Design a protein with these regions (language model features):
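Catalytic-core segment of enzymes that process non-peptidic bonds
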Residues: 57-125, 171-172, 176-218
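ATP/NTP-dependent adenylation/nucleotidyl-transfer catalytic domains that generate, transfer
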Residues: 23, 119, 179, 205, ...
Length: 512
């Protein structure tokens, strides 16, 4: 039996484009003689956008789309796709099976397959919950699964750096243990700051693989298989770059901006963001803005210039010395601007310049904060938290270094200057300042954050590996800075737990 997967683009509210994708791929399936065509879960996710789905216009559009598909599909091919539907006073996600202008089956319950027979083959259809991929035990989907020849999964699965390998390992076991073929269809494209990676696949009952491309359209059939191939470390780095690039291109396109800009400090975070922006949009559409103060080192200023030269983007220098002195004079009769007040004032003056440039040039400001800084609030609200999109906000500081090293190795040259990589991290808001004056070394900080936030490890367990005072300091900073995280730029999701997605706590809590 010939089964095909249409790996279509996520279209959100664009119902016309959804139907256009359907028609193109349905006709392709007919031309190829496909018996079954599987789409991802189509249309907007009602669980995230309940306000829209409370309006009759959107529910009516979905019903019209499903009715259009039913009218189009004749007896030559069977179509399987996921969608939302208004049922019993609420919206639910279901999977529909359509052939010969009739709905043969609908499946709504998560992780409980429905069954039908088509051309003497038994099919199981699964509304799969992505969270199961991160659990160690594979659930039993029922004894009836062993009677099926095919398990069909129309998905809408966000990209995370570990997820493709988890999907393949998970469904390889399901295929082999139940002696059936897996058909897994997924979107590609961006949904706000999250991204669908595609990577749809077939896995046969022998554990062999046929996989679609990542981050682009593909149309594949179950006509040839090879050994399972898991992502290597370098391939994961490449996918992170592709994911961030795809989100940025879509974000710029749909938000109506023509270019992007960022504050360029000469540090590794802004260097990586500039590099990723050039990869995604071309250097001609990227502007770096250097805003040195009297605390900025000569090395940071020259490193920013060297980065601009190597990547080919425009660099503008806007010193903040005069602005800072004028602001300080106007404030000093009312309050003292020394210490942290003066440090934050510098960051906010830089934010002022960056946002003014955005208004003036119709340019999207890219935030340059990393996940480590965001987690512990090592940032200035309305200063370096400004921006429309945070490209590296889901990468811990140590991961930033790893990605930079990969990029330099890939191009066999230091397109991100070696001085930027080797220098001690510093906000340069006072003389001789280092991040380690305030935080543990990033090698320690990131392990603590990973264990607590990502792996759900208990505090007592973490105490076994690090000094209690260090762990307590890190967690206290995390718990008291939710108010900053709530006001930050949307973060491009590349890990299984991301601020603004899975990671959220009450602003007012008694954990400090």
């Amino acid at each position: 039996m010939k089964i095909s997967i249409a790996q279509t683009k996520y279209r959100g509210l664009d119902f016309d484009k959804c139907l256009e994708d359907f028609k193109i791929n349905y006709n392709e399936a007919l031309l190829r003689g496909s018996d079954v065509l599987v789409f991802p879960s189509m249309f907007l996710d009602h669980t995230k956008y309940s306000e829209l789905f409370g309006r009759s216009k959107y529910s009516q559009n979905i019903c019209k789309c499903i009715e259009f598909i039913r009218e189009q599909v004749d007896d030559r091919t069977l179509i399987i796709f996921g969608h939302s539907v208004y049922k019993d006073g609420k919206f639910v996600d279901i999977i529909s099976v359509i052939s010969d202008h009739k709905v043969i089956l609908t499946v709504s319950q998560c992780n409980s397959p429905g069954f039908f027979t088509y051309k003497e083959n038994v099919f199981a259809v699964l509304n799969f919950e992505d969270a199961l991929l991160f659990k160690e035990l594979i659930p039993k989907f029922g004894e009836n699964l062993k009677k099926a020849q095919y398990l069909i999964i129309p998905s809408k699965s966000y990209f995370t750096k570990e997820k493709n390998n988890l999907r393949l390992k998970f469904f390889e076991r399901v295929a082999v243990e139940n002696n059936l073929d897996i058909v897994y269809s997924n979107f590609y494209g961006a949904e706000d700051s999250a991204v669908y990676d595609g990577c749809s696949f077939f896995i046969n009952s022998f554990g062999k693989l046929k996989q679609a491309k990542g981050f682009e359209f593909d149309f594949i059939s179950n006509d040839s298989f090879q050994d399972l191939k898991f992502d290597t470390c370098n391939e994961l780095f490449e996918k992170i770059i592709l994911a961030i690039s795809l989100v940025l291109r879509e974000y710029v396109c749909f938000s109506g901006f023509s270019k992007v800009h960022l504050g360029l400090s000469g540090g590794i975070d802004s260097a990586l963001v500039a590099c990723l922006a050039c990869f995604a949009l071309g250097a001609e559409n990227v502007v770096g803005i250097s805003m040195p103060s009297k605390f900025s080192s000569e090395g940071s200023i020259s490193d920013a210039k060297e980065l601009s030269r190597k990547l080919g983007f425009k660099l503008i220098e806007m010193p903040i010395k005069d602005l800072f002195e004028a602001s300080s004079r106007s404030f000093e009769s009312h309050f003292d601007v020394k210490g942290v007040t003066g440090e934050n004032l510098q960051a906010r003056l830089r934010g002022l310049l960056l946002m003014a440039y955005s208004n003036s040039q119709n340019s999207l400001l890219l935030n340059t904060g990393n996940k480590s800084e965001i987690a512990v609030g090592y940032c200035t609200l309305y200063g370096d938290t400004c921006g429309g999109l945070a490209l590296i906000g889901d990468l811990f500081k140590t991961e930033v270094y790893d990605l930079v090293k990969y990029i330099n190795a890939k191009f066999d040259q230091c397109i991100i200057p070696i001085n930027i990589i080797l220098k001690e991290p510093s906000a340069e808001l006072r003389f001789d300042q280092k991040d380690s004056d305030y935080l543990p070394k990033y090698e320690v900080l990131d392990i603590i954050l990973n264990r607590y936030l990502i792996d759900n490890e208990s505090v007592d367990s973490i105490y076994l590996y690090f000094e209690k005072s260090i762990v307590d300091k890190v967690l206290n900073l995390y718990f008291k800075n939710e108010y900053k995280r709530r006001q930050g730029a949307p973060i491009v999701k590349v890990s299984k737990k991301t601020f603004g997605f899975e990671l959220s706590i009450p602003i007012l809590n008694n954990m400090v």
